[in-house]
């Protein structure tokens, strides 16, 4: 009997161990820690997704091979694809796409010129321009009235947008030109872009050409980069919605040959001259037809009444010492606000013509 119970005890122990092992192997997976697999609550901000841009096929374009500066390159002639979200390829047939030329034709005098831009008049809605592009032909995107978005790749070596490049792109609301650090030419580039509200100009740009933003009536604010030296007449004619302008330190205000003012907006409310500007000795730069606030940094040492054609009330606040007044008196009703702790204001003898001048210390 004792032997029997011993044998039964051994069997019972064996069965218990077997049951325990089986229960360990069948533990529900939901109870197993999942530290190697992130849950749905794990933030994904550390691994942002990047949209993959798929270039248009070469068959979407008429193009040719051209030798420029010892390099064989592709020139795009005309877009014939159906995609409305255009991604210009950076290479075709193993050669870099360098020039958005357009359709050319030789006239009776033997001169060959562009008669139709690459995308002119098409129904495209967006365009991505790769860094391989170096130049645009006439009216590249002109009259693309459905075009809403344009993106330039970083490192674009474009120096000129060509005449009427984006003319009459009436659906375009914003354009960021900051990647185009070598940009020089913008001749009538955005004429009649009547929905354009915001423009980001590149640091490195030195001139805004004639008619560049002609009739951009929805443009509300403008930040002029420090590199900008000159604005040619008519550049902002018809920008009747422009409310604020920030002026960089290198803009030359004096433009004696100008036949009209550079900024003439009835909506203008604020003009800010940024630190580093030394002279406000300009001619017909701003037409003041509504109450305007002007901020002048301490770096300014020369001012001129000719800079502002004031037909309303202008409040101009000086941060530094009283500058020297060159040429004409202030025009219209002017309120000058100044810091009484700065030099020269107690002896200020400024005056106004066709209006009143009020000196008002900042308390």
Each language-model region and where it sits:
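Short, aromatic/basic amphipathic alpha-helical patches
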Residues: 260, 327-333, 343-356
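Structural signature of tandem-repeat unit edges
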Residues: 65-71, 81-99, 107-135, 145-160, ...
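Short beta-strand/loop segment at the start of cytosolic alpha/beta domains
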Residues: 53-79
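C-terminal capping region of solenoid repeat domains
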Residues: 41, 46, 347-363
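Bacterial N-terminal signal peptides that target proteins for export
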Residues: 1-12
């Amino acid at each position: 009997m004792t032997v029997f119970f011993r044998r039964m005890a051994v069997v019972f122990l064996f069965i218990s161990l077997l049951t325990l092992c089986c229960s360990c192997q069948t533990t529900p997976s939901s109870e197993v820690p999942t530290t190697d697999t992130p849950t749905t609550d794990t933030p994904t901000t550390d691994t942002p997704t990047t949209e993959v841009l798929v270039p248009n096929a070469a068959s979407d374009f008429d193009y040719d091979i051209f030798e420029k500066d010892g390099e064989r390159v592709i020139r795009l002639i005309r877009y014939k694809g159906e995609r409305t979200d255009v991604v210009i390829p950076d290479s075709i047939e193993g050669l870099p796409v360098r020039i958005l030329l357009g359709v050319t034709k030789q006239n009776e005098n033997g001169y060959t010129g562009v008669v139709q831009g690459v995308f002119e008049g098409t129904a495209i809605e967006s365009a991505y321009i790769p860094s391989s592009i170096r130049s645009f032909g006439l009216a590249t995107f002109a009259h693309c009235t459905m075009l809403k978005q344009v993106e330039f790749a970083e490192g674009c070596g474009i120096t000129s947008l060509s005449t009427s490049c984006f003319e009459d792109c009436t659906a375009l609301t914003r354009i960021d030109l900051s990647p185009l650090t070598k940009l020089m030419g913008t001749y009538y580039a955005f004429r009649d872009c009547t929905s354009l509200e915001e423009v980001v100009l590149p640091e490195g740009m030195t001139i805004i050409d004639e008619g560049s933003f002609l009739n951009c009536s929805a443009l509300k604010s403008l930040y002029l980069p420090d590199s900008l030296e000159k604005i040619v007449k008519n550049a902002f004619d018809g920008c009747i919605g422009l409310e604020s302008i920030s002026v960089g330190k290198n803009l030359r205000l004096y433009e004696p040959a100008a036949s009209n003012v550079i900024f003439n907006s009835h909506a203008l409310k604020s003009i800010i001259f940024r630190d580093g500007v030394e002279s406000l000795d300009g001619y017909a730069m701003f037409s003041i037809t509504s109450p305007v606030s002007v901020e002048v940094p301490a770096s300014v040492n020369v001012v001129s009444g000719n800079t502002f054609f004031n037909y309303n009330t202008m409040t101009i606040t000086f941060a530094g010492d009283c500058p020297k007044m060159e040429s004409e008196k202030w025009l219209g009703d002017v309120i000058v606000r100044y810091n009484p702790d700065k030099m020269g204001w107690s002896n200020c003898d400024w005056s106004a013509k066709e209006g009143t001048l009020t000196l008002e210390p900042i308390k």
